[in-house]
């Protein structure tokens, strides 16, 4: 009995020793982390994370004459974004932020068009290219890795504004849809006519023609609600065509314009 009791006491002592060691290491790690944050703060560095959602669209500017009317628009599902960033403050007002962001940019639209460049996939899997007059439904679901580099200006203790360029890399892509209630003239507006009426539709998919690298401008504002929590809004405006240079089915350039809204945490 004494031997068993002694073994139990030894186990308890070992457990207590392990717990004390873990607690000590955790406390040391926390202290080092706090010291690192304090050092960064004293040297003008600030780190943060953001999480939000995006709403907007991919559109030509201005709307070309081929697009006669926008019949409907929807965000195209939940489009989330996650970002980590570092800010260097040069003085009490001015600073610069570099970030890395994963962002979804979606939309779904329906439009009435006339002589709109189109390459459709017919029922037997073949392609027909020409000019479409009628209804067009477009679905865009793209995911990007984005690197913004923006200048910051503190308007007050709680408010700051930012502006600067960004570059992005396309990770997942989808630009597709279908045409309905209209006709296709091939190869041009004086060519043979193919009609689609009632439930007859034809699909298209331009996903493989999307450009991998894009760039643009970002303009934003941020309000610090609490010591570490803030609310932000960033508008991103693409400045180069989303399609590759050799893609000529659609005769005009299209640009991604999205508003990203969410919450951030400053360490």
Feature locations, PLM:
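Transmembrane beta-barrel strands of outer-membrane/channel proteins
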Residues: 49-55, 98-104, 163-169, 233-237, ...
């Amino acid at each position: 009995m004494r031997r068993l009791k002694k073994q139990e006491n030894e186990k308890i002592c070992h457990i207590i020793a392990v717990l004390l060691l873990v607690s000590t290491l955790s406390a040391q790690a926390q202290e080092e982390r706090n010291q690192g944050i304090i050092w960064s703060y004293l040297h003008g560095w600030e780190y943060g994370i953001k999480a939000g959602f995006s709403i907007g669209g991919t559109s030509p500017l201005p709307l070309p004459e081929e697009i006669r009317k926008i019949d409907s628009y929807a965000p195209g599902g939940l489009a989330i974004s996650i970002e980590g960033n570092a800010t260097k403050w040069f003085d009490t007002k001015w600073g610069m932020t570099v970030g890395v962001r994963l962002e979804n940019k979606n939309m779904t639209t329906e439009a009435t068009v006339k002589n709109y460049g189109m390459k459709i996939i017919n029922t037997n899997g073949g392609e027909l290219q020409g000019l479409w007059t009628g209804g067009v439904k477009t679905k865009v679901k793209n995911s990007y890795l984005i690197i913004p580099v923006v200048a910051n200006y503190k308007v007050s203790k709680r408010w700051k504004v930012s502006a600067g360029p960004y570059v992005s890399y396309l990770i997942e892509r989808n630009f597709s849809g279908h045409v309905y209630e209209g006709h296709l003239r091939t190869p041009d507006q004086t060519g043979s006519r193919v009609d689609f009426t009632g439930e007859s539709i034809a699909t298209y998919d331009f996903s493989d023609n999307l450009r991998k690298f894009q760039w643009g401008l970002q303009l934003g504002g941020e309000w610090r609600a609490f010591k570490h929590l803030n609310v932000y809004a960033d508008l991103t405006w693409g400045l180069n065509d989303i399609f590759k240079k050799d893609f000529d089915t659609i005769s005009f350039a299209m640009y991604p314009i999205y508003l990203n809204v969410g919450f951030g945490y400053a360490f």
